[in-house]
A protein has these predicted regions:
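Short, charged, surface-exposed hinge/linker loops at domain edges
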Residues: 1-13, 41-68
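Aromatic-residue detector
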Residues: 22, 36, 47-51
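Short, surface-exposed polybasic/aromatic micro-patch for ligand or macromolecular engagement
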Residues: 33-43
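A short, structured beta-strand/loop element
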Residues: 13-35
Length: 68
C-alpha cells in the first residue's frame, strides 16, 4: 500500500520514520528533492506546502523546470 497525499496539485508519498517518530513526506515527479516532516497530519500538510513553495521558488529563480 502506498500512502499518497496531494498538496497544491502535487502528489507526495508519506511514511512514518520510527527513528524520528515523525511523519515524512516526499513529493513525487519533481526534478529535485523536496521532503518534509511533521508530528501529525495537519503539520504534514503545513510543512508540505512550505517545502513545495520553497522548492518551486528556487526553481523559478534558477530557471529550472520543477518537473511537474
Amino acid at each position: 500500500m502506498r500512502n499518497v497525499i496531494e498538496i497544491d496539485g502535487h502528489e507526495a508519498v508519506v511514511a512514518f520514520d520510527p527513528q524520528l517518530r515523525m511523519l515524512r513526506g516526499e513529493f513525487l515527479g519533481l526534478s529535485g528533492g523536496a521532503d518534509f516532516y511533521a508530528e501529525d497530519v495537519e503539520g504534514l500538510f503545513r510543512e508540505g506546502r512550505l517545502s513545495l513553495k520553497v522548492f518551486l521558488n528556487m526553481c523559478a529563480e534558477k530557471g529550472i523546470d520543477p518537473g511537474n
